[in-house]
Amino acid sequence: MVNPTTQPTSAAPARDGASPRPLRGMAPSPARARSAAERSAEAAQGLSIVVPLHNEAASIARLHARLVEVARTLGANRALACEVVYVDDGSGDDTLAVARALPATTLDVQVVSLSRNFGKEAALLAGLDHARFGAVLFIDGDGQHPTAMIETLVGHWLDGGYDVVFTAKAHRANESLTRRLAVKMFYALVNWGARTKIPEDASDFRLLSPRAADAVRNLPERNRFFKGLSSWIGFRQIRIDYQPEERADGRTTWNLRSLIGLSIDGLTAFSVAPLRIATMLGLLLALTAFIYGGQIVFETLVYGERVPGYPSLFVGVMVLGGVQLIMLGVVGEYIGKILYEIKGRPVYFVAEHALKPREEAKQTESDNRTAAE
């Protein structure tokens, strides 16, 4: 559920060209579908494909070749102009050099190099800010998001009238039990008591219509959680299940530490559940202490028994001290986010930006000029 008036329609993977079907328990979105004329006008604005990169020198050429074919297909079947925006997020390898050399055959190529590693959320925003066309599609640079699905996502946007077409993992059978439990705990916590739910297992591989892209782009906060924000904006949304492909080149730059950091940032940027849990835990401990204190008074007055003091006092102080420090850390995370917002620093800085127009467009322009002469 995105909000009380707009819900995403969830769909199972299409088979043999069939359109996705709504899953049970998910109501279709009541938001008004855009007319054919509106969708045609949006298609004329084109499609920007944003690819955040961090140490992906080994995989970017293969991914670009796939995107070139996708752009050729979309241009032939839907007359859709495309561009790709590569955002180098402070890579330590040759990612930037490889990106600069990529050919612009069937689509324009932008290369945006950030001044340092600002993180994936900043890279996504940088790509969104530099996107020149109307709709924006986000795809990871490691090649694990299936580019063959891009045409399906575009179809739901143009033919189905959806504003947010997001993908989610069909299953996690190939992942460890610990990771699966951690993912479930994260989504349970971030969605607990939230008015806007983030679809479980949703990925950053998604397409935003022009108005959805503008909505996300214009949100003022600097602590951004892309999955949450693209759900929060509402509009008509649909889920498409997919299974990540095996990584063909290089190795992942994500480790346990970075995943935990991303989870904490997403949780504190989009949910107040930890603060509510702290309040409930404080009330529970206070109630427990009150009951235990009442029991001590009762036993002392009625039975005249002396309750052993030191062990129980020591354990109680240690438990309360540990809980207080944990809750202080939770509050500190939110205060840190507030401080970051108040400072008003830019989310990122651009060190280098280059635009390479597609060769097919230049050739067509040259042919037209020659014919006119």
Which role fits each region the language model picked out?
Residues V2-D16, P20-A44, F225-E373:
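Hydrophobic helical membrane-anchoring modules
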Residues V2-D16, P20-E175:
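Structured catalytic core of nucleotide-sugar glycosyltransferases
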Residues N55-A58, Q144, R217, E221, ...:
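Residues in soluble alpha-helical coiled-coils and helical-bundle/repeat scaffolds
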Residues R62-A65, E69, A97, K184-Y187, ...:
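Generic recognition of well-ordered alpha-helical segments
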Residues E69, T73, A101, T105, ...:
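Conserved amphipathic alpha-helical interaction elements at protein-protein interfaces in regulatory
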Residues Q110-R116, K120-H130, Q144-L229, E245-I264:
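Acceptor/aglycone-binding surface of glycosyltransferases and processive sugar-polymer synthases
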